């Protein structure tokens, strides 16, 4: 029985330590001011360099100037395009506010103190993105807005050189963060034209600032035919450049709840690359050479995703793009849990209630394991007098003691691990729930009731963590404790306090789950102990 309780304590401490360690990496508030000061102090230059074509060693030089900007706006997305090169230099997510209760949209792509842009163009023999500079596209007007009743908007930008007409078209769709970026090359000459498409994302090579609501991790990722999903951090980029030839795939720049990604033609052979240069990290792709015969034309397609980690829409955009919602090793549990969470939310229309609903469902499913755990622990308690007698009888003869204990367990039909296995089974589920709540952009700025207006942020008044600690204390008092070792007793007594401190700065959605879980456990434990009392396996007297 002592070993069961010790295992429970060690397991909870281990899970808490792992979660708290990860949280410190993602949410460390102490470095926020320092990192933000670094970002503000360094003004990154807007780099216009593009990748070299296949079998070329040159790198395109930076442009000293920019063209004018053009704004494209749908119901959920506003893009700012630089006509010099046709790069996306800003993206505003109109359905996501920058801060709670703010009317300012969240800005994903941006320029200024830091660079975070999505570039694309054409290199190669007749490419217009060269060492001489970037193309200055012409566009009909400065602002384009998706009209009411219109589901799609196409905005062409044109550039003509040496008898070849290049048209770069952006296609925005209603309710979508998936933007089609297509090149049409119309060869009006008597010579063959060869171009090679590319798309890349550039980001100022600085550690991201941490906060309580936004984690510090920002880095690259890619997908290839061989690897469904692979993170490639800025540190990885500084150590070695990516150079992967693959069919299909994509490249991306990840933040906590948001992602920008280039998705090339999935039927073509592409090269995925990365590099760092002048304080800028770049991850991108280069497509195959496209040959356009005289007096003919060709269209090269690609997609740009710049928006929240919407799993359903990302999955429809490109294979494995939804894996940027990173559940870690517990993904096979977290995915169905997230599906359950969204299903319940569609009924109750409140994410806090959905968390409570998921907790109830999970605890109900696990109830047989919980009952088996408490029953096994109760049977072990009943054997404690006999076990103590054996210890006194056999003393230091551990082999004989072990043999007699195994014999006793067999006669009494008690599994000494019966109280441990249910605990071990439930731990991965808790970890999966943790990542589900931490990765769900749906919880960002999602209100519950009263003072909880953002389930992704800490409780501003620490009420939920304190209630959670109180529920742990009550649960501990309800549980029979045969522990006699003073050190173990102190650890057990200190656990509710320690957990309360851990959870003071955790997202309120996660604390709400733990509090609900404790309350359900208290009810289940009361029911189980009442049943055990009837069987003579439990007594309320301690």
Curated annotation (Swiss-Prot):
It is found in: Cell inner membrane. GO terms for molecular function: membrane insertase activity. It comes from the Bacteria. GO terms for biological process: protein insertion into membrane; protein transport. The chain crosses the membrane at residues 7-27, 338-358, 417-437, 455-475, 494-514. GO terms for cellular component: plasma membrane. The keyword Lipoprotein does not apply. It is a multi-pass membrane protein. It holds the Pfam family 60KD_IMP. Keywords: Cell inner membrane, Cell membrane, Chaperone, Membrane, Protein transport, Transmembrane, Transmembrane helix, Transport. Belongs to the OXA1/ALB3/YidC family. Type 1 subfamily. Required for the insertion and/or proper folding and/or complex formation of integral membrane proteins into the membrane. Involved in integration of membrane proteins that insert both dependently and independently of the Sec translocase complex, as well as at least some lipoproteins. Aids folding of multispanning membrane proteins. Interacts with the Sec translocase complex via SecD. Specifically interacts with transmembrane segments of nascent integral membrane proteins during membrane integration. HAMAP family: YidC_type1. NCBIfam families: PRK01318.1-1, PRK01318.1-3, yidC_nterm, yidC_oxa1_cterm. This is Membrane protein insertase YidC. The lineage of its organism: Bacteria, Pseudomonadati, Pseudomonadota, Gammaproteobacteria, Pasteurellales. The gene is yidC.
């Amino acid at each position: 029985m002592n070993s069961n309780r010790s295992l429970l304590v060690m397991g909870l401490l281990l899970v808490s330590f792992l979660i708290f360690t990860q949280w410190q990496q993602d949410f460390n508030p102490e470095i926020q001011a320092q990192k933000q000061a670094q970002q503000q102090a360094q003004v990154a230059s807007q780099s216009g360099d593009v990748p070299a074509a296949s079998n070329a060693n040159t790198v395109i030089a930076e442009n000293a100037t920019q063209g004018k900007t053009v704004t494209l706006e749908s119901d959920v997305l506003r893009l700012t395009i630089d006509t010099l090169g046709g790069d996306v230099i800003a993206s505003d997510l109109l359905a996501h506010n920058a801060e709670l209760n703010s009317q300012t949209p969240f800005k994903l792509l941006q320029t200024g103190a830091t660079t975070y842009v999505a570039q694309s163009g054409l290199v190669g023999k007749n490419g217009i993105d060269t060492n001489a500079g970037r193309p200055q596209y012409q566009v009909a007007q400065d602002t384009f807005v998706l009209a009411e009743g219109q589901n799609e908007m196409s905005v062409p930008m044109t550039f003509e050189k040496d008898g070849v007409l290049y048209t770069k078209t952006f296609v925005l769709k209603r309710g979508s963060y998936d933007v089609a970026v297509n090149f049409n090359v119309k060869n009006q000459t008597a010579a063959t034209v060869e171009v090679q498409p590319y798309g890349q994302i550039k980001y100022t090579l600085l550690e991201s600032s941490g906060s309580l609501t936004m984690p510090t991790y920002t880095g690259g990722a890619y997908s290839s035919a061989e690897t469904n999903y692979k993170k490639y951090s800025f540190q990885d980029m500084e150590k070695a450049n990516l150079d992967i030839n693959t069919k299909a795939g994509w490249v991306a720049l990840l933040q906590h709840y948001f992602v920008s990604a280039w998705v090339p033609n999935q039927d073509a052979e592409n090269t995925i690359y990365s590099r760092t240069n002048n304080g800028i990290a770049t991850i991108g792709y280069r497509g195959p050479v496209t040959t356009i015969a005289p007096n003919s034309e060709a269209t090269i397609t690609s997609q740009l995703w710049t928006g929240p980690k919407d799993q359903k829409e990302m999955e429809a955009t490109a294979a494995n793009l939804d894996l940027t919602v990173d559940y870690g090793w517990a993904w096979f549990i977290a995915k169905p849990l997230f599906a359950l969470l969204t299903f319940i939310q569609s009924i109750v229309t409140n994410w806090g209630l959905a968390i409570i609903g998921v907790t109830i469902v999970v605890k109900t499913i696990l109830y047989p394991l919980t009952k088996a755990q408490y029953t096994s622990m109760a049977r072990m308690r009943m054997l404690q007098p006999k076990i103590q007698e054996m210890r006194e009888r056999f003393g230091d003869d551990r082999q004989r003691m072990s043999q007699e204990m195994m014999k006793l367990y067999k006669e009494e039909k008690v599994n000494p691990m019966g109280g441990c296995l249910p605990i071990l089974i439930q731990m991965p589920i808790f970890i999966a729930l943790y990542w589900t709540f931490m990765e769900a952009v749906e919880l960002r700025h999602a209100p519950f009731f009263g003072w909880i207006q953002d389930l992704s942020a800490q409780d501003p008044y620490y009420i939920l963590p304190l209630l959670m600690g109180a529920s742990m204390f009550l649960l501990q008092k309800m549980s029979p404790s045969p522990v006699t070792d003073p050190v173990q007793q102190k650890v057990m007594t200190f656990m509710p306090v320690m957990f309360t401190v851990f959870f003071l700065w955790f997202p309120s959605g996660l604390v709400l789950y733990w509090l609900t879980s404790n309350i359900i456990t208290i009810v289940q434990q009361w029911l189980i102990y009442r049943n055990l009392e009837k069987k003579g396996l439990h007594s309320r007297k301690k």
